[in-house]
């Protein structure tokens, strides 16, 4: 059996994770002092990725039930990293906070993706009748 809402959440989560990975790649490049040149293309990619995250994060987190838990951390990352050059100029303390916030968001998204994939796998083995029967049997008769 397939759950349309579950599939929607997984697609949304996959897009978020991909954007956070792209942002991480660009931040990592910016922090590598051995790479002296920041190209206009890298700045464009950074700005585009950051803009996508700014536009989609609140909606995605709300749909996934993570808004209260992750929105502050996500905004901290997006506000600290305004450009590749800007990331390069952060102090060591700011870099540690940026990395910690990014890691917190990314870890939670990855954990949720694993949980949703596990739920999808368990649903794949159920028929429509057994799924609805299990829901009815789990329902609290006093909760109406």
Regions found by a protein language model. Name each.
Residues 1-144:
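Conserved non-transmembrane functional hotspots
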């Amino acid at each position: 059996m397939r759950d349309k809402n579950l599939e929607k959440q997984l697609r949304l989560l996959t897009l978020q994770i991909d954007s956070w990975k792209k942002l991480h790649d660009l931040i990592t490049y910016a922090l590598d002092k051995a790479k002296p040149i920041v190209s206009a293309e890298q700045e464009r990619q950074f700005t585009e990725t950051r803009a996508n995250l700014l536009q989609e994060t609140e909606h995605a987190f709300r749909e996934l039930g993570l808004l209260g838990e992750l929105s502050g951390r996500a905004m901290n990352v997006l506000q600290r990293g305004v450009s590749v050059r800007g990331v390069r100029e952060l102090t060591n303390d700011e870099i540690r906070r940026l990395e910690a916030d990014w890691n917190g968001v990314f870890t939670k998204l990855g954990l949720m993706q694993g949980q949703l994939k596990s739920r999808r796998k368990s649903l794949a083995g159920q028929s429509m009748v057994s799924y609805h029967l299990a829901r009815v049997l789990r329902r609290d008769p006093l909760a109406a």
